[in-house]
Amino acid sequence: MRQLFGIDIGGTSVKWAVVSENYEFGDRGSVPTAFVSADQLVDALAALVGPYRGQVVGVGISAPGGIFSYEADPDGTIHRGGALPYMDGFPLGRVLRERLGLPVTVVNDGKSCALGEYAAGALRGVDVGCVAVIGTGIGGGIVVDGRVLMGAGGFAGEFSFLSNNVNEPLDHCDTFATSSGWHGLQNLVAVELGISDEAELEALDGRRIFELLEHGGASEVAAVQRGLDAYAELFDRVLVNLQCVIDPAVFAVGGGISCHPALFEALDRKMDDVMAHYTGFLKDMPRPHVVPAQLGNDANIYGAVATCLQVL
């Protein structure tokens, strides 16, 4: 059975694993992303793969930034660089391929997550599916017939930039990222709890929010639930818009705060409220089917390996 080397380059760490073509994990590890140049990153990646060069048949990399498909750009050039601005314009795929003598593919991290969930997670067996990852913004991707939808400029699936309110002047502070990234939940819950102190707000992370929901006093539980419901309704409204455009069979939602079942209970409950507004000739509007993503922090490695398998 063929073995591949999967790499997930993040802003704080580089995770790696040796993965079979059936998505079984072998050796794995991580190193800090303590690099200041593209050359340093390449040296580190080459050092990680080096001991396995005789064992693996290819290297799949998930990375931040704008990245075209392998067919459109086999050099795996990273545009913008995302969390690693020094990678802007760097042909990571070509440079590492020449260094290692192995096939190398590079895919955007959000798209990698979507393809990973298709290969081995919540989107298995689905013809059209979407993944939305709740972080600082909303990462994600769209999978159609087993391939990630790239779009004409590689920008398909960049859900963070969707505008929330078309009746207001354009404002980067009124996007799906700001309303539905985890800070959006933090801010809504803080308002309900009457928190304005910066230190208190900083302490109100996802873990604390759900801790209060489960173990807080009656007034705290009610306040957190109101904030969570408001967050869920904003999230669901965007999913309904995406349903109209893409019509996926499944939306898989992942990210740190998605681990708590209370989030999905709120998303399901508020989706009923949102869909109740679609009446008359709109009553047959399909209800978005929202499920938890399944692969957690490994999703990008799964997707990186799946991308590499597509070109071997």
Show which residues each predicted segment covers.
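A cytosolic small-molecule/anion-sensing beta-strand core signal
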Residues: 20, 63, 144-145
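Short clusters of small/polar residues that mark proteolytic maturation junctions
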Residues: 30-32, 83, 153-154
